[in-house]
Curated annotation (Swiss-Prot):
CDD domains: GDC-P (cd00613). Belongs to the GcvP family. One of its GO terms (biological process) is glycine decarboxylation via glycine cleavage system. The modification N6-(pyridoxal phosphate)lysine is found at residue 700. This is Glycine dehydrogenase (decarboxylating). The keyword Transport does not apply. It catalyses: N(6)-[(R)-lipoyl]-L-lysyl-[glycine-cleavage complex H protein] + glycine + H(+) = N(6)-[(R)-S(8)-aminomethyldihydrolipoyl]-L-lysyl-[glycine-cleavage complex H protein] + CO2. GO terms for cellular component: cytosol; glycine cleavage complex.
Length: 949
């Protein structure tokens, strides 16, 4: 046996476990199990045509060699991406630490207090630097955040504006080009008309509901927008700012100028450029708009003892509850990167951020003054970090690239130079020497940075920020390291136990896949660097696209969408473009089964589609007759069907080919949601079932870690007819011949983390990928067999099998006074994160073990739920003081002098023998969600200030 095969490390069950597992299920082989699970007509007839699998050692050498093809030049391109210094303790203790990167979105607050606090720090940083009242837990990138700001301002129009269909949105010509492209994509299907122009000549017409300004502008100009905002307010036009987060340590905050929304990226707070991402965008607004905000919001509440506890707030705004009426389709954002950016603010504190901002500004002023002496004149009347000079762009570019330096060239006579945190005096002298050579003059040299500010006094920041203790007490490395560890210890991640969240695929994120992310050759490249400097990246990304084409059976892939929700949106926009190209723009009806994930209707609404919900049968399958009826009824305006396969109920529906054929016969296309692709890879694929487009979650099926709520990557794979419509980028041309405008800010989205999926596929190979799928199905059916007789299993296939996940029905336990949430909280006492609660059916648990979990871990989890089942039996409806209702139990409870519970401390904390060996303690008791929403606090202000009398 090849013991160096990566698949052996990735897949949990050992060869010696198989017989026992198969026997428990009641089959003779994995082949028989797969045969009984997958419909015969959708099985692949040949293995995937992929390269032979590499070992981990071979991949490490391969990725290092490939990385050498990337040329890391000094980058002064700017445009929202800047070289930054990643503090080593943050890189080592967060970015490279599975305790942080393998966690899931903090749905179970009691075992997520660490990252909830870290995100609260991020929100506080954003609120105080922007001068706003509330901020969310991050968004995907600056372009997406700007589009969400536009959507929010459209949503909060006045009654008269809605009545009069006021639909124009002003965009300053200073906006970043990639942001403009994303705004164009988002505005068209929802009926918003963009008007791009000079803010100084804007007429404040009543036809406008909102405006967005860049602060500072794309080439560095800093404007005082106070008068603009005041005039806009008089005309009921609300103004959003896209602001550079570092500049706000030196400049007057947008909040002080009257902004309604402020967005931007926190990339330059210690997160590497990574050829475009991932980075955490931010979104801040006024308290009055909180219920229209997109994304997650972390708020302060109390636990069952009245102690301060954190949790996700205002969840009813989100797509999994509001569906097509949600504020946004975004679920996964960029939590890991938000944690890094927030910790950067903690480490540097207000004085440190001010120092860095002033140093960056001084570098820009020093460069401008030196170039001025050469006769190269700067055109910005005021600037923070970026200067725009008049020069022969072609000549400067040739000399700069010879010296391994990148500037940005807006036109033939202009050069934009964006200075950053890493810029030194010797870097400035190199810049001066490049221009001197271009002019044929002798270079002047500088020996130190100037102390003179170039900012107008009216725009210099005078207000304080980050005054809370957390930003002023962790400035030595020991302090920071211990603070990070303190938070990490409060969180349950994959490095402690399995996380069986259904529809989330919490599989192994192997160290060998993650290592390249820390290599400078991969993480230090600007997304708009000339392509010849990114040969390693282009090779890797194109290869990954080819691998995904083979796996899905499709003809083309774009990696641009940087979350599953963005992938859904991109797929629907490609379908929309296809119909428009055939003069069938009237095709706008989207059929969605009632069992679909909430992102589906939310994405369809964003794509301007009319949503028709189709029924499901009592067995949980799509009701084919109801679908037929609705497809025929809407055949003249049918755009598409959105279908998840295997279904959200964890079943391979045998009628899938009939379903897709039905849609095609009535003029529509089929969009397959790839959330459950982990049950397909190597066994079947979207093309075989008749889909036209699918999105994949690289953070599920293809091993990118969830990061506590992001990053994610949601590429779309399409058939021949949709290839021409894959999205482009305004600076680096990518996508199809009739490409839609940008979905995300960067041409390849979150390119850096694509290395993980590339590594996963490359090391697994065709055989390993197929084996992973088979073992995912094996693990799910083994658990299902163990649960039978203890919990009703809600849906199964025709042979009684689950796909890769199953639903346990907990609704009957209400007779014993037990809710499904009680089971979720009690699992924490057993050392486990709960499965998915009340989705897709209220009162149920959806369990997905993945292929990475070994037999011993599966058994521990099964033992825990079976033990809880016995505890449920012992409970009575009128008993509110039992071990389930009081769960989870904290160490403080167990060690308290008083114990007023009718069960032992041992039963509370150590209900099964295995727990004592590796006990995980929740850090708070059950969190009061309702209290937190009534008393919303989303920053680090002391809780006492917000308590109701």
């Amino acid at each position: 046996m090849k013991t160096d095969a990566f698949a052996l490390r990735h897949i949990g069950p050992r060869e010696t476990d198989l017989q026992h597992m198969l026997q428990t299920i009641g089959v003779d082989s994995i082949e028989q199990l797969v045969y009984e699970t997958l419909p015969d007509d959708i099985r692949l007839k040949a293995p995937l045509n992929l390269d032979p699998a590499m070992t981990e050692y071979e991949f490490a050498n391969h990725i290092q060699e490939l990385g050498k093809k990337n040329k890391v030049f000094k980058s002064y391109i700017g445009l929202g991406y800047h070289p930054t210094i990643v503090p080593a303790p943050i890189q080592r203790n967060i970015f490279e630490n599975p305790g942080w990167y393998t966690a899931y979105t903090p749905y179970q607050a009691e075992i997520a207090q660490g990252r909830l606090e870290a995100i609260l720090n991020f929100q506080t940083t954003v609120i105080e630097l922007t001068g706003m009242e509330i901020a969310n837990a991050s968004l995907l990138d600056e372009g997406t955040a700007a589009a969400e700001a536009m959507a929010l301002l459209f949503d909060v129009r006045t009654r008269d504006q809605k009545k009069n269909n006021t639909h124009k949105f002003f965009v300053s010509e200073e906006i970043l080009p990639q942001t403009l492209s994303v705004l164009q994509t988002r505005s068209t299907p929802i009926g918003i008309e963009l008007v791009v122009g000079n803010h100084e000549t804007f007429d404040f017409s009543t036809e406008f509901f909102g405006a967005i300004l860049q602060y500072p502008g794309k080439y560095g100009q800093v404007n005082d927008y106070g008068a603009f905002v005041a005039k806009a307010k008089e005309n009921e036009i609300k103004v959003a700012f896209a602001a550079d987060i570092l500049s706000l340590a030196a400049l007057t905050s947008p909040g002080e100028m009257g902004a309604a929304v402020v967005v931007g990226t926190t990339q330059r707070f210690g997160v590497p450029m990574g050829y475009g991402g991932p980075h955490a965008a931010y979104f801040a607004t006024k308290d009055e708009y909180k219920r229209s905000m997109p994304g997650r919001i972390i708020g302060v509440s109390v636990d069952a003892n009245g102690n301060r506890a954190l949790r996700m707030a205002l969840g009813t705004r989100e797509q999994h509850i509001k569906r097509e009426k949600a504020t946004s389709n975004i679920c996964t954002a960029q939590v890991l990167l938000a944690v890094m950016a927030g910790m950067y603010a903690v480490y540097h504190g207000p004085k440190g951020l001010k120092y860095i901002a002033n140093k960056v500004h001084a570098s820009a002023v020093t460069t401008a003054e030196a170039l001025n002496k050469l006769g190269v004149f700067q055109t910005n009347t005021a600037f923070f970090d970026t200067i725009l000079v008049k020069a022969d762009a072609q000549k400067v570019k040739a000399i700069a690239e010879k010296n391994e330096v990148n500037f940005f060239y807006p036109d033939a006579e202009s050069v934009s130079i964006s200075l950053n945190e890493t810029t030194s005096v010797s870097d400035i002298n190199q810049i001066i020497a490049i221009f001197a050579e271009a002019l044929g003059k002798e270079a002047v040299t500088v020996s130190e940075l100037t102390t003179a500010s170039q900012l107008p006094a009216s725009l210099e920041r005078t207000s304080s920020f980050l005054t809370h203790d957390v930003f002023n007490n962790h400035h030595s490395e020991s302090q920071l390291m211990r603070y990070i560890k303190k938070l990490e210890r409060k969180d349950l991640s994959l490095n402690h136990s399995m996380i069986s969240l259904g529809s989330c695929t919490m599989k192994l994120n192997a160290a060998s896949e993650m290592l390249p992310l820390s290599m400078p050759n991969w993480n230090s490249i600007h997304p708009f660097a000339p392509v010849e400097q990114a040969e390693g990246y282009i090779t890797m990304l194109k290869k990954l696209e080819q691998q995904l084409n083979v796996i899905t059976g499709f003809a083309g892939t774009t990696l641009q969408p940087n979350s599953g929700a963005q992938g859904e949106y991109a797929g629907l926009m490609a379908i929309r473009a296809y119909h428009l190209s055939r003069n069938e723009g009237h095709r706008n009806v989207c059929l969605i089964p009632s069992s679909a994930h909430g992102t589906n209707p939310a994405s369809a609404a964003m794509a301007g589609m009319k949503i028709i919900v189709t029924k499901t049968t009592p067995e949980g399958n799509i009701d084919v007759e109801d679908l037929r009826e609705k497809a025929i009824e809407h055949k003249d305006d049918l755009s598409c069907l959105m279908v998840t396969y295997p279904s959200t109920h964890g079943v391979f529906e045998s009628s899938i080919i009939e379903i897709t054929k039905l849609i095609h016969e009535n003029g529509g296309l089929v969009y397959m949601d790839g959330a459950n692709m982990n049950a397909q890879v190597g066994l079947t694929n979207p093309a075989t079932i008749g889909a036209d487009v699918c999105h994949l979650n690289l953070h599920k099926t293809f091993a990118i870690p969830h990061g506590g709520g992001g990053p994610g990557v949601g590429p779309i794979c399409v058939n021949e007819k949709l290839v021409p419509f894959l999205p482009t980028n305004p600076i680096l041309k990518v996508g199809g011949e009739q490409a839609i405008t940008a979905i995300s800010s960067a041409p390849y989205g979150s390119a850096l983390v694509c290395l993980i999926s590339y590594g996963y596929i490359t090391m697994m190979g065709a055989e390993g990928l197929k084996s992973a799928t088979e073992h995912a199905i094996l693990n799910a059916n083994y658990m299902k067999s163990r649960f039978e007789g203890h919990y009703p299993i809600l849906y199964t296939g025709e042979c009684g099998r689950a796909a890769h996940e199953m639903i346990l029905d907990c609704r009957a336990f209400k007779e014993n006074g037990i809710e499904v949430g009680d089971i979720a909280k009690r699992l924490m006492d057993y050392g486990f994160h709960a499965p998915t609660v009340s989705f897709p059916v209220a009162g149920t648990l959806m369990i997905e073990p993945t292929e990475s979990e070994d037999l011993a871990e599966l058994d521990r989890f099964c033992d825990a739920l079976i033990s809880i089942r016995k505890e449920i039996e012992a409970a009575t409806a009128d008993d509110k003081n039992n071990v389930l209702k009081n769960a989870p139990h904290t160490l403080a409870m167990l060690t308290s002098d008083s114990w007023d519970f009718p069960y032992s401390r041992e039963k509370a904390a150590y209900p099964l023998e295995y727990i004592a060996d590796n006990k995980f303690w929740p850090s708070v008791r059950r969190v009061d969600d309702a209290y937190g929403d009534r008393n919303l606090v989303c920053s680090c202000a002391p809780i006492e200030a917000y308590m109701e009398n």
